[in-house]
Amino acid sequence: MKQSGPAMYARTLGRIVVRSHAVWIVTGALAVLFGAFLLYSMRTGFIVETFQMALDSVHQSQIRNSDAPEYIQEEERLVASQLQDVVNSFGTKDFAASMATYYRTVADIVQTAFEEGRVDETADSILQNEGTAQLYEKVAQLANPVFYDDSTRFPLTYYTLYMLTQLPFFAWYIPLIIILGIYIHERENAKLLSHVPVSQPVLIFNLFLALFTASLACVLVAWLPAALWTLLNNGFGDPSYPVMFVTNGELFSLTVGEALLKWIAVFVGELALLSLIAAVCLSLNIGKAAQTAVVLLLALPFIPNYLSGTVPQFLLKYLPSTFLDEARITGIPGGAVTIIDSGPGCTFSAGMTTISGWCIAVILLALCACTAVGFMRIARLRRQHA
């Protein structure tokens, strides 16, 4: 059966990507990044020596503070007792409960000392202590309360979120830049966009679909080896495992499952927007401008003080570049509650609204450009036949 012009063109776009050595090299490099912490063990602090050192430190503090007020000595005795329970219960089913009790005790002591003016803590630090206590309390309530102390033992869901938020965000957009560069090269060599048997809107749609699906496929293929290894060796994991983080003066609590879904949603939205911008530029024969625009957008978050002064604060949540680093929205899994600077009002819902709005704006601009190109072609034909 003879294929239509759009179908043949879409097939050509796909064939160009599959046959490109650069695409496979980038995909392989991303696969190595995904599997890095399966090969190189990252310890998270859940080892008995860590808590034994903390206990020794408290004992030394008790000796130094032997003449301190009674309430200080009582606080140190309580902390020492809780730490001793943690050390004694290490490796048993009571370990999670002991950890939760210890961190709750620390959070309450610090909160009281802060209210009484005995410690110089920031509001975020107080929230961080409270978040740590809640994190361990939530873990203790799980059906299987475990602490992941070694990256080589992370289950699939936890490892995936850990790697997605630990590695530089721009790594996941490199395939798009490479594929866009390949299409630009093909256009300049008169192999791709010359005598295209499709209309301008169909051309944009085909280019968008090719850029978006190929880039997404590269990331998925790169993820698969590490995903299969962790699934077979460490299991799927508990999607309800907690993730806590502090941002904009608020304490946020998510599960690993929720955080993964939010990361994927923001990433897919950003990738779609960048692919759309690139497709429109390519269709208008300004491919190099497309590549420059994508690179500049990815580079914006690296501007010094991007979130704290360089860009007006009220504009941040309306810029898609603000949400490129998905970890600012999902938090970073681990035994410590992270303090994340994400910009005022830069939440998941705000990010999805901003990305959707920009996608709609680019589509409208593309329609206007297509209409203008159509009118110019009609005018040129009329002049030729005049």
Placement of each model-derived feature along the sequence:
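Aromatic- and glycine-rich beta-strand/loop motifs that create alpha-glucan
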Residues: 1-26
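Alpha-helical transmembrane segments of multi-pass membrane transporters/translocases
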Residues: 22-38, 274, 331-386
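Residue-level recognition of pore/gate-forming positions within transmembrane alpha-helices
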Residues: 30-34, 211, 297-301
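Secretory targeting signals
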Residues: 33-61, 138-184, 205-283, 338-357
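Transmembrane helix segments
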Residues: 41, 282-319
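Long, solvent-exposed extracytoplasmic domains/loops
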Residues: 59-156
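Short helix-to-coil transition segments within interhelical loops
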Residues: 194-201
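Short hydrophobic, aromatic-rich alpha-helical segments embedded in or entering the lipid bilayer
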Residues: 312-343
